[in-house]
Amino acid sequence: MAQAAGPAGGGEPRTEAVGGEGPREPGAAGGAAGGSRDALSLEEILRLYNQPINEEQAWAVCYQCCGSLRAAARRRQPRHRVRSAAQIRVWRDGAVTLAPAADDAGEPPPVAGKLGYSQCMETEVIESLGIIIYKALDYGLKENEERELSPPLEQLIDHMANTVEADGSNDEGYEAAEEGLGDEDEKRKISAIRSYRDVMKLCAAHLPTESDAPNHYQAVCRALFAETMELHTFLTKIKSAKENLKKIQEMEKSDESSTDLEELKNADWARFWVQVMRDLRNGVKLKKVQERQYNPLPIEYQLTPYEMLMDDIRCKRYTLRKVMVNGDIPPRLKKSAHEIILDFIRSRPPLNPVSARKLKPTPPRPRSLHERILEEIKAERKLRPVSPEEIRRSRLAMRPLSMSYSFDLSDVTTPESTKNLVESSMVNGGLTSQTKENGLSTSQQVPAQRKKLLRAPTLAELDSSESEEETLHKSTSSSSVSPSFPEEPVLEAVSTRKKPPKFLPISSTPQPERRQPPQRRHSIEKETPTNVRQFLPPSRQSSRSLEEFCYPVECLALTVEEVMHIRQVLVKAELEKYQQYKDIYTALKKGKLCFCCRTRRFSFFTWSYTCQFCKRPVCSQCCKKMRLPSKPYSTLPIFSLGPSALQRGESSMRSEKPSTAHHRPLRSIARFSSKSKSMDKSDEELQFPKELMEDWSTMEVCVDCKKFISEIISSSRRSLVLANKRARLKRKTQSFYMSSPGPSEYCPSERTISEI
């Protein structure tokens, strides 16, 4: 369909191709009356609503139809009387035109345009239009009923219906004489309608402002079309819903007779629809009259009822009434939300004052490693308690044997067999059956005399790093010579040959109250006061790991941070030697080539790993895992990393070698050379305390940096071993054996007080 520009004021009339009348029943023309329809006939509107149009719609249809007829008369188109309401077409944009009459009663024939007229006078067309509008206002009423119209509308229809009788001489109907007498017609009141212009003037005079007539009446016709289409959609949905309900009911109750649903007729639905629209336009107005000047006619039809309601809500043009309950406002509306909350708080039982509250003691929080280190640094060094006998013995150890008070009273009455027995017990590391028998006989001979024993220094206190292997070899050989002695004393002698340093803090030594200390088999019994706590040497692993860090280090110890800096400087120097190879140098400098293997290139899909030590990109094959201290502990010496920082694979491979040696018979230890013994000791090499390595993180380092770190650690630990050896030798020279023979030739002897 081709649409014209405007409705009444003058524009080209639109032409239409009539495809049939609209929906006579809401369900019959559901597809035809969809969103694609642009025009509805007045007869379709009346049939759909099943009630007459209101007065404002009648004013609008009359004004818009006369406007289109006036525009057609200027183009000298033939006139035609309006025979039925089906010829009046209301368009979507608010225009109203006349269609030619249908030959048949059912549907109109196809016509070239909207305005196809035969020769007829203008007054006849106005008269027929007035009659059709009156029938639309009287639609649905009985013959004996008549609708009461407002005086202006009744006068307009009366003038339009009596136009032919009032002016029978004007047969041509041209507007030449009308245009010449235009000023006089504007001054005097229109007593008779002779042209379309007179009808339009009467319609415009109905409004408060005549200049708003075109826009207002166009808006009314546009609203009429929109509301009619919405009603049709509403009725179509209701009918489809009823059909679906019937189908569901038939499926559920197939055996029973189908009962018809109680339906509301279309007329009832249309009546309800009209009532809702009327209430929205007239009755429900959520706005104050005092806020703006109320202009009922031009504004009411500019928007649909829904748009009007939403506009009033957005602009807050409403006043809410106070809801009264039993003649009074409800309590919850009297107070604000803040006051209600305060009243609720006041209604609760009073709270206890803060001073009267007794909170539970906070649970003890486990101290972190950092706090424990700081506490040990701030605390004074605690010395372990020693018995008076040990103090006396340490004093005797500071002078030669000849100056000792115990050996000055040398009145030896002990047989030679006792001395040999003590020597053999010292070599084998345990008491034999002869010692037990001899001790029993001695106690029987002298029951009243109490046995006071002096303890000679053990081999573990005198041997150095070089003499330890020889002593072990000697003890194992002696154990193999005398098969009657058990093999356990040799293990105990080896495990107890190291003494903890005498200046260890008491927190690092185990408490002797927890378990009974084992009696040393190579020492002679002595009595100690019961109120003096005995010192229990720690286990081999803990004593060795702590002993390493207690002796003063007299060599240069590089820290982790310094080694990292040295490695980064070496890497930069290594990069400079590739300057003559521009491609390799550029790729290495930009991080597009692995710095270790220099064969793997990195692309968008192949990412590189960054070595945390030298800060250079490496590939996955050259990247290894290594545990390193974090930033606060980067000042630790590099030798403190030890084997624990190396990769798990290497440490496990290294541990497999000595693990087999531990399961071999003890007698085969004597067959090892010094090289195999050093390999066994490397597995038991001293490590950094595990409690200080809890927060070390596993970092990614390249194979070159890992090798570099391992070499520095091994060299630093060799220097540390030499320093520890010198420290041990310096301490052990302060012994009362000033001119003792070599460790391989020395055999200690112990004598009791009674023997002296």
Swiss-Prot record:
Tell me the segments the record calls region Important for interaction with FMN2: 131-138
Q: Polar residues bias located where?
A: 425-447, 529-538
Which keywords annotate this record? Acetylation, Actin-binding, Cell membrane, Coiled coil, Cytoplasm, Cytoplasmic vesicle, Cytoskeleton, Host-virus interaction, Immunity, Innate immunity, Membrane, Phosphoprotein, Protein transport, Repeat, Transport
Q: Result of mutating residue 138 to N? A: Abolishes interaction with FMN2
Residue segments, region Disordered: 1-35, 425-538
Specify the KIND domain's residue ranges: 40-231
User: Which range is the signal sequence, renumbered to this chain?
Assistant: none
- Spell out the coiled coil positions from the record: 229-257
Q: SUPFAM superfamilies this protein is in?
A: FYVE/PHD zinc finger
Output the PROSITE patterns linked to this UniProt entry.
KIND
Q: Which CDD domains match?
A: FYVE_SPIR1, WH2_Spire1-2_r3, WH2_Spire1_r2-like, WH2_Spire1_r4, WH2_Spire_1-2_r1
Record's subcellular location: Cytoplasm, Cytoskeleton; Cytoplasm, Perinuclear region; Cell membrane; Cytoplasmic vesicle membrane
The alphabetized list of GO BP terms reads: actin cytoskeleton organization; actin filament network formation; actin nucleation; cleavage furrow formation; establishment of meiotic spindle localization; formin-nucleated actin cable assembly; Golgi vesicle transport; innate immune response
Which residue ranges does the record annotate as region Spir-box?
556-576
Start and end residues of each WH2 domain:
305-323, 369-386
Regions of biased composition (Basic and acidic residues) lie at 512-528
Modification Phosphoserine, positions = 387, 406, 464-465, 467, 678, 682, 735
Q: What is known of its domains?
A: Binds to actin monomers via the WH2 domain. The Spir-box targets binding to intracellular membrane structures.
Listed under subunit, the entry gives: Interacts with FMN2.
What is the name listed in the Swiss-Prot or TrEMBL entry for this protein? Protein spire homolog 1
